[in-house]
Amino acid sequence: MTNTIVISCLHNIAAILYCGQIQKLVVANAHYQVSDIYLGTVDKIFSGINAAFVDLGKNEYSGFIHISDTGPLKKKYYINNITNILTIRQKILVQIIKEPTLNKGPRLTANITLSGRYIVLMPFSQAICISRKIYDEDERHYLKALAILIKPPTMGLLFRPSAIGIDEEIILSELTNLKEQWYFIQKSAINNCAPVLLYKDEDIVKKVIRDFYDNNTKNIVIDSNLGLKQLNYYINTWQCNFSSTIPSLQLYSSNKCILDTFRINQAISRALIPKVDLILGGYMFIETLEAFTIIDVNSGSFNNSTSARETVLKTNCSAATEIAYQLKIRNIAGVIIIDFIDMESQRDQLQLLEHFDKELSLDDAKPQIVQLSELGLVELTRRRKGKSLYELVSNDSNYFHFFIQLEQLDSIKPSSYKSKRLSSSVKSWLFSEIDMINRVFFKKSNLYRLSNFYYARNLYIIYSDFTVNKNIQLAARYKLMYSLQNIQILPSTWYFNFLDIHTNNITNYLS
């Protein structure tokens, strides 16, 4: 389904486009991400739930490991109490299988795996596995026989769907690389003190080409010379299982940011706003809570049908199409509850569910409609595949900050600022790019605008006086949906030192 892949090595972001529309965003996570391998230390053990917390050496939540994921650590197969497996301050080799959420640490396993394009090496298993997506029985028998011949004696192999029709020498070469990678990880575990990160897949070019490049890819655009060289290498290495036509590879050289040219910035900005307008005139709200996500559909101004029943059905079907897209672009996972506009006709309900299921079938995260409840709510689940877009951009260490330099404020009562608003010139671009700000309570300001304002999490106020005035804090209260969460006041004398540290995060554009 892919037509174009856009990779920004400078921002560690990639987008998968189909017919010009962004279908998926890939954002490299600077913190925990799936497949990271750590040498951790056991921090706490909870025998009641047969689980433990593992310190991974970062100032965040510890990793969580359940007894079901401790297979290689068990001395005997029938051990069913985690206290017989782990002890406090014990060093263990673990891998992340689920990225952390806003209030939970990463899920860990001791069953380490190393993924390649065609095979997955399992150092602590001796199993031979063939992907369920390989349906041809002859191909399955062939791959199983090949695995028996090439498998290391103490390791296991899993063949991915991309292994179909691949020459044995190529698979052997990849197996050799994975084994060398594993030996390097083992050596690092011996030579380093726990807790420490041993392996991280930081190459966004490799990740995107390995996971998303296929026969339908026509164009690949990248904004880095080094990235283009890597791209050529991976394309030439893995081209054998695709058509003979190599896609067009383009180095992006325009002065304009690649994320703006392909409207990736705009897509991210819109995906962070709860309200989504529908093509036919309705709208919906998407609210993500800790336990589940709620989507509320409303007809709005749409009334172009011959009957109210037809209006409701068309609006709901339009919303179903948009919801399927929003789940992918926002990477929303877990339990999702949708409140469509009420429909009394069971025939209309069936038509809506059939249409919705068809739209969801295009999602590789395998959403499943559970039921239409008695209250008319559609319940579905979607498999978690990495962090949601909101969780990624809420991480201030990955993205930019937003700076406001205030002129000295007169000592006026804070209440007098409540009627003040941003100047029209400032408000025009703020509200056009990200419709999240309600009011800003200060008199005069100069705003140093970042190219990606919606990435901002922290607001730094540069005050021209040495005195930290409480009125400034009151004056700078923002009401945001998903952005600024911390306000910090810096005297102007600290400003220049701060700029030296964060130069790469600040643009020279003065609004």
Curated annotation (Swiss-Prot):
Query: Briefly, what is this protein's role?
Result: Involved in intercistronic processing of primary transcripts from chloroplast operons. The endonucleolytic activity of the enzyme depends on the number of phosphates at the 5' end, is inhibited by structured RNA, and preferentially cleaves A/U-rich sequences.
Keywords assigned by UniProt, alphabetized: Chloroplast, Endonuclease, Hydrolase, Magnesium, Metal-binding, mRNA processing, Nuclease, Plastid, RNA-binding
Instruction: Give the residues the record marks as binding Mg(2+).
Output: D296, D339
Query: What does this protein's record comment on cofactor binding?
Result: Binds 1 Mg(2+) ion per subunit.
Name the species this protein comes from: Porphyra purpurea
Gene3D superfamilies, A to Z = Nucleic acid-binding proteins (2.40.50.140)
Required cofactors, per record? Mg(2+)
- Residues of the S1 motif domain: 35-117
Task: Show the GO cellular component annotation of the record.
Answer: chloroplast stroma
Query: So what family is this one in?
Result: Belongs to the RNase E/G family.
Annotated Gene Ontology MF terms? endonuclease activity; metal ion binding; RNA binding; RNA nuclease activity
Q: Which gene encodes it?
A: rne
The record's EC number reads: 3.1.26.-
* Annotated protein name in UniProt: Ribonuclease E/G-like protein
- Please, one GO biological process term? mRNA processing
Where in the cell does this protein reside?
A: Plastid, Chloroplast stroma
| Major enzyme class | hydrolase
Is Plastid one of the keywords? yes
What the entry lists under CDD domains is as follows: S1_RNase_E
